[in-house]
Amino acid sequence: MSEVTLQAFLDDWAGADPLRCAVAATVERLAEAGVSIAELVARGPLAEDFGKVRGDEANAGGDAQKELDVIAEEELVDALGRAPVAFLASEESETPIPLDPHGRVVVAVDPLDGSSNIDTNVSIGTIFSILPYDLEQHPDPAAALLQPGSAQIAAGFLVYGPATILVSSLGQGTQVFVFDHDTATFILAREKVEIPAATKEYGINQSNVRHWAKATQRYIDDCLAGKDGPRGKDFNMRWVGSLVADAFRIFTRGGVYLYPGDSRKGYADGRLRLIYEANPIAFVTEQAGGAATDGTTRILDIQPKQIHQRIPLVFGSREEVAHIASYY
């Protein structure tokens, strides 16, 4: 069986449909930028001090901004400037970045998820969401970006690790592509990802237990009780601290991920952003048979109120996600 490239896969999906062709071109440019970012990441300490914080600077969400965060955004702006993208919303920029005034889509990105791990050689990545754009319907670019996640045409994430991997969905299942250095192309590795419905593995930053709501504490306590507790089975706990790395593990072998809100200042709604982290992750998760909520409400049903809005996130194996909701 011959290998299927990302371009061939996108061309077959898009056909002659103008909007689909715009989406396909956008995904190709995102993948292109991802390769450039992966090459920078791979140089590690041999390159500039990419893990260095930019003085007292913070991004639009208030997080410390590192050199590679900014460089990754620049790579994406350059690549998407050659795609039919009207506006780009980024974690690193306060307001939408205008690109093609005649663009058919808008894109929201986290240019470099997990950048706190830059210096430790842990997998990091890029998360993206693609939404339809109509100038007459959305003369304000912010309004175009504040569509619910269910309106996404495509979404996905790139992982910069031992392999450079693209996990994406065009609304017809979730696919995994791997970058082949010999041919300089992304090759289809898994055509239909299916997240197992049940799991014995969860991921959460357990050091924050004292700050959690009682519902979150009870769920984790029941998991820790193992086969002798109410769950009747032993659980493993895995936590990388890089959303794309934790997500790819779930897409590979199942599991559930929790980033709840807690009682710390600034953490009432967690730390993840709705439109460029939770929404795209929820989209590819559901397309792979999983589920994604804020603890109780389906992520893709939530109406965004602002571009950098935060949201608690629970996603992964659908039976476990549903079980977690029963605690709230």
Swiss-Prot record:
Pathway membership: Carbohydrate biosynthesis; gluconeogenesis
Matching Pfam families: FBPase (PF00316), FBPase_C (PF18913)
SUPFAM superfamilies documented for this protein: Carbohydrate phosphatase (SSF56655)
Location, primary (coarse class): cytoplasm
Location within or outside the cell: Cytoplasm
Residues that coordinate or bind Mg(2+) 1: E91, D110, L112
Binding site for Mg(2+) 2: D110, D113, E277
This protein's UniProt keywords: Carbohydrate metabolism, Cytoplasm, Hydrolase, Magnesium, Metal-binding
Origin superkingdom: Bacteria
GO cellular component: cytosol
Gene Ontology terms describing biological process: fructose 1,6-bisphosphate metabolic process; fructose 6-phosphate metabolic process; fructose metabolic process; gluconeogenesis; sucrose biosynthetic process
Sample GO molecular function, one term: fructose 1,6-bisphosphate 1-phosphatase activity
Cofactor(s) for this UniProt protein: Mg(2+)
UniProt-annotated binding residues for substrate: D113, G114, S115, S116, N205, Y257, L258, Y259
EC number per UniProt: 3.1.3.11
Enzymatic class: hydrolase
InterPro entries: FBPase_C_dom, FBPase_class-1, FBPase_N, FBPtase, Fructose_bisphosphatase_AS
HAMAP family with a match to the protein in the record: FBPase_class1
Subunit structure, as described in the record: Homotetramer.
Family: Belongs to the FBPase class 1 family.
Protein name, per record: Fructose-1,6-bisphosphatase class 1
Lineage: Bacteria, Pseudomonadati, Pseudomonadota, Alphaproteobacteria, Hyphomicrobiales
